[in-house]
């Protein structure tokens, strides 16, 4: 996957993976009809280039639900972030300093009123309808505390965004062999490779922070 510091985008596609809910089943969003629900997308920007523009533009077709986009501006190029936000109807928050990723995301979510919240890196490019597929997966899996999409690298390969909780042996094997033998069995197990890794919905131990969807009720319980 492209990291947040690189300008080449990662694609968010429509094949969700989920992490078990550790705070109890959350059903507030499920009381509304799907087309009545709303979603807030939060992203943290630090002197972004064209990546933020692509991110915001792609969100226009990612969901048919009511969408609110909030950008936490942690950098110094405030005019660039503000201009991009104005072009795409987003809101910018920040105090002019670098709050850090977590604090920036929390600030952007501070007044959350929507039914769902997404925290995503600004170098993602959303495929049409992909956010709705992700939310639909959340509705179909009410015990999931957090969901993430299938992430594609710029070359179309799958980034292992849903991973297992490694044992000591598997973790050590992945750490030692991962770079010199990428397809080793320890890394494959850690990356939860195998059937279903590139499609459908599956349960994983943890999800990449590049793109996370949570029911608003689950987010509030974490505060």
Segments and roles (model prediction):
Residues 53, 77-86:
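Acidic helix N-cap motif at the loop->helix transition within catalytic regions
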Residues 66-75, 93-95:
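Short beta-strand/loop segment that forms part of the nucleotide-sugar
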Residues 117:
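Short aromatic/hydrophobic "clamp" motif used to bind/position activated sugar donors
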Residues 127-161:
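Conserved donor NDP-sugar-binding/catalytic core segment of glycosyltransferases
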Residues 193-223:
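Aromatic-glycine-rich donor-binding/catalytic loop that engages nucleotide-sugar donors
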């Amino acid at each position: 996957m492209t990291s947040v510091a690189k300008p080449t985008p990662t694609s968010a596609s429509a094949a969700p993976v989920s992490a078990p809910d550790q705070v109890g089943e959350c059903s507030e969003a499920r009381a509304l009809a799907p087309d009545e629900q709303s979603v807030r997308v939060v992203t943290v920007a630090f002197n972004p280039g064209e990546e933020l523009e692509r991110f915001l533009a792609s969100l226009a077709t990612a969901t048919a639900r009511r969408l609110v986009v909030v950008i936490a501006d942690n950098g110094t190029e405030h005019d660039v972030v503000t201009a991009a936000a104005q072009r795409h109807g987003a809101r910018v928050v920040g105090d002019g300093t670098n709050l850090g990723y977590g604090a920036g995301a929390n600030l952007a979510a501070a007044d959350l009123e929507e039914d769902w919240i997404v925290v995503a890196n600004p170098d993602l490019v959303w495929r049409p309808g992909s956010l709705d597929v992700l939310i639909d997966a959340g509705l179909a899996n009410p015990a999931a505390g957090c969901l993430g999409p299938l992430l594609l690298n710029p070359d179309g390969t799958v980034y292992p965004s849903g991973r297992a909780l490694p044992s000591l042996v598997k973790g050590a094997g992945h750490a030692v062999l991962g770079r010199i033998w990428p397809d080793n069995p320890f890394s494959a197990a850690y990356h939860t490779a195998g059937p279903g890794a590139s499609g459908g919905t599956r349960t994983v131990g943890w999800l990449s922070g590049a793109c996370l969807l949570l029911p608003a009720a689950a987010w509030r319980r974490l505060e």
